[in-house]
């Protein structure tokens, strides 16, 4: 099983950061930890690399598991984060932006991500 880490990132307006991946799915930024890197550090780095947004971890959420298109099982550890700034696209991504919770609910492709959004909104400090 491959380990991953990602961020559910909100700005001060309570908008959430989403990416549109190579296959056209709207998702949260995530990726693989580098050797010697904690999952929290990996999540912060992946948000930066994939979106250009500097984010800080507020608290851990929970892991999700899925099988990727290559048949590899992945476990992604998620963190609630605060960030600001205009997103920019990493090569291979087809969209990025800040969205209201209502917009995000309509865009997110996977049920696990919808669940993460709801838990993150409940735990997000005012």
Swiss-Prot record:
It is an enzyme of class 3 (hydrolase). A motif (Nudix box) lies at residues 31-52. Disulfide bonds: none annotated. Keywords: ATP-binding, Hydrolase, Magnesium, Metal-binding, Nucleotide-binding. Changing residue 49 to Q: Very little effect on hydrolase activity. GO terms for biological process: AMP biosynthetic process; ATP biosynthetic process. Changing residue 50 to Q: Strong decrease in catalytic efficiency. This is Diadenosine hexaphosphate hydrolase. It comes from Thermus thermophilus. The gene is ndx1.
